[in-house]
Amino acid sequence: MLSRKWIAAAALVAGTSSVAHAGYIDTTFTSGMTTQVAGATTYDFDSGVKPDGYGGAGAVLTDSVSGMAAAPAGDSTAFLSVAYPSSSGTETFLAAPGQQYNYFGLYWGSIDDYNWIKFYDGSTLLGTVTGTDVIQAGAQLGDQMAPGSNRYVNFALNDMSFNKIEFGTSNFAFESDNHAMAAVPEPGVLALVFAAFGALFLMRRRRTADLTF
């Protein structure tokens, strides 16, 4: 299991009173196509329609579409493709009123540098992660079969919680499956998540995220 950490610096949101916490998002990578966090709520898209809370320029597909969408490697079930059938756009997950999460995981397929995920608490942007941030070192962007560009990615938000996620792409396409969310009690979110993974912590790399407000 590999880990990367992004820092979310406190910043005033222009035109509002919202302030992003001085917290961080820790990103880990685990084997398989599903979360290893016990008790997480999982959305697998197998019903063929988007679950409650999802909306925007995304579609649930049951197979690859040449030149437009590719099923994540090894995934023979339905998956979410953003922004099919368009080349660019965003899909948004909005939590139920009063619900906050600090863990999110997904099986991210054929990771591209023009894919991104943004975490929000209301209108406050907590952090942005792009495909470049999560692809395995040395892997080819957009590879539809290689494990380094098709991987289960876990995000643990420390000293922050989210109620909205934006999935975006500026070209064909952002494919994913088995979204998972959980509210892990703080403090010690990261330690609890690592315990759930049951894997050794191998490497940590810290970098500062460029946030746009």
Regions found by a protein language model. Give the residues of each.
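Bacterial N-terminal signal peptides that target proteins for export
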Residues: M1-I7
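Bacterial N-terminal signal peptides
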Residues: A9-T16
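Hydrophobic alpha-helical membrane context
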Residues: T16-S17, G198
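Sec/Tat signal peptide C-region and signal peptidase I cleavage site
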Residues: S18-A22
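Surface-exposed, well-ordered secondary-structure segments
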Residues: G23-A183
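A short, hydrophobic C-terminal helix/tail in secreted or cell-surface proteins
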Residues: E186-R204
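C-terminal membrane-anchoring or membrane-association module
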Residues: F201-F213
